[in-house]
A protein has these predicted regions:
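Short, Lys/Arg-enriched N-terminal segments with co-localized hydrophobic residues
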Residues: 1-11
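Generic secretory/membrane-interface signal
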Residues: 1-3, 23, 101, 253
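Terminal low-complexity, poorly structured segments
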Residues: 7, 21, 189-192
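Trp/Phe/Arg-rich N-terminal binding region typifying the photolyase-homology
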Residues: 10-168
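Glycine/tryptophan-enriched, flexible segments
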Residues: 152-275
């Protein structure tokens, strides 16, 4: 709810697009955000906690991470991240109507239920505005790396040899300044999503992990500096620096795979160890 009809009228004079955050909780090398920033004056950032569609439940530890990641992202947006809960079709429709959105865009997710949901949403919204989607979480699209018979790989090593070693290099990461709309839209507070259960071990995660995009860059750089030497053996011991500790950042999209790829290629330890 906004405070006055006049405020809504002010939005209509602006060239505004909507980015739907999903598993891409970052600003750097975010293909959807980069696309919108090239075509629109202002961007509205929205995260919707979908508890309506029949989906696998998010694990308890992952919920803790999501809670902290959303708070961090909201700070990056200077408090302008719109957090909502419920059916994405209904929630997005409200935002699109209120802000008079010209285009909605997101980065694709590849779980089967998400593919179906997002296809339905794209068909639903396409009649009234432009809808775009991008690959923001994979080095290659699933249909780009296939066996000779046209079916997907099920074993990692053949996929690695044909994908990582033989396929064309993935796109270069792109880092643009993103201008988010400064608004007074009243939305759900992250704490109201009830992602935390007040169990003691949740505080340990928060205390021992720095959850946020900039921290992922720091961890990546430390791993490339100290973790590549003796990686072949050291990766089997979680206590050693040879374990990257990047998994949760990758899962929630706080670092792009393209950034990881090209930063690794520039690293001298990578070259010295023939990884």
């Amino acid at each position: 709810i906004l405070h006055s009809p006049i405020y809504k009228y002010m939005f209509m004079k602006n060239n505004i697009a909507l980015h739907w955050f999903k598993k891409d909780l970052r600003l750097a090398d975010n293909p959807s955000l980069n696309y919108l920033s090239k075509n629109y004056e202002k961007i509205i950032g929205v995260y919707i906690y979908d508890d309506i569609n029949p989906i696998p439940k998010i694990g308890s530890a992952s919920r803790v991470w999501l809670n902290e990641a959303l708070k961090y992202l909201d700070k990056q947006l200077n408090g302008n991240l719109i957090v909502l809960r419920g059916n994405p079709k209904e929630q997005l429709s409200k935002i699109i109507e209120w802000f008079d959105i010209n285009e909605i865009s997101w980065n694709r997710c590849y779980e089967p239920w998400m593919i179906k949901r997002d296809k339905d949403l794209k068909s639903f919204f396409n009649s009234n505005l432009k809808v775009s989607s991008f690959n923001g979480s994979l080095l290659w699209e699933p249909w780009e790396i296939l066996k000779n018979d046209g079916t997907p790989y099920k074993v990692f090593t053949p996929f690695y040899k044909r994908g990582c070693l033989e396929a064309k290099e993935p796109r270069q990461p792109e880092y643009l300044e993103i201008n988010f709309f400064n608004h007074n839209f009243k939305n759900t507070d992250v704490s109201d999503l009830n992602l935390l259960t007040k169990k003691k071990w949740e505080k340990k995660i928060i205390r021992n992990w720095n959850v946020g995009e900039n921290y992922s860059t720091e961890i990546m750089n430390n791993f490339y500096k100290d973790g590549l030497n003796d990686y072949a053996d050291g990766r089997n011991f979680p206590i050693k620096k040879n374990v990257s500790r990047l998994s949760p950042y990758i899962h929630w999209g706080q670092v792009s795979p393209n950034t990881l790829w090209y930063e690794l290629k520039k690293n001298q330890n990578y070259k010295n160890n023939n990884l």
